[in-house]
A protein has these predicted regions:
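Bacterial N-terminal signal peptides that target proteins for export
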Residues: 2-14
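N-proximal, low-complexity, solvent-exposed accessory regions that precede a main structured/catalytic
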Residues: 31-45, 49-52
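Short, surface-exposed beta-strand/strand-loop-strand elements in extracellular ectodomains
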Residues: 103-113
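Extracellular/periplasmic metallocenter environments
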Residues: 118-165
């Protein structure tokens, strides 16, 4: 009698362990990266609703400071802070801030998609105009700061940008 009961507990334990492994394995398979640039074809995520500017109209990118963080908002209707957006190659992009007495810096590292590929450093009275030139998907750092602030620059954000051919 004890032998059968022990066997029942063992088979139930094995079945439960198998179910747990199966569920966790399928959850890992469905888990996607939160970054668009990690997708196989990030350009396929571009739509008219998330494409900024055109050959005849510049794309404005507003970099603001909010508490201890910074936000990047493209000039797209209903845009959200730090959202992924697209720009067609050849489009003029204007980096600016709508915050008074605020500076900003944008860094693409060693592979900037813009011409000129100098660091993008500006402020409330100094917009920076560049031209999108190198197609691809880019993760970049953006930060904002107040002149004379005790804690200096805000925490950077890590938004993404696709330059379309």
């Amino acid at each position: 009698m004890k032998m059968k009961r022990h066997y029942g507990i063992s088979s139930a334990s094995i079945a439960l362990a198998g179910i747990v492994l199966l569920v966790s394995g399928s959850a890992q398979a469905q888990k996607k990266s939160k970054y668009v640039c990690d997708e196989a074809q990030p350009a396929s995520m571009c739509t008219a609703a998330n494409t900024c500017g055109s050959a005849s109209a510049p794309c404005t990118v507003d970099i603001t400071k909010s508490g201890s963080s910074s936000n990047v908002k493209p000039g797209i209707p209903n845009a959200k802070n730090n959202q992924f957006f697209c720009v067609k190659s050849g489009t003029t992009v204007v980096f600016m801030t709508s915050n008074k007495n605020t500076g900003f810096m944008v860094s693409f590292g060693t592979d900037s998609p813009f011409d000129p590929d100098d660091p993008i450093i500006g402020g409330a009275n100094k917009q920076i105009t560049v031209k999108a030139s190198t197609p691809g998907c880019y993760k970049y750092d953006a930060g904002a700061f107040y002149s004379g602030a005790t804690y200096g620059m805000s925490g950077g954000s890590k938004p993404e940008l696709v330059i379309l051919p």
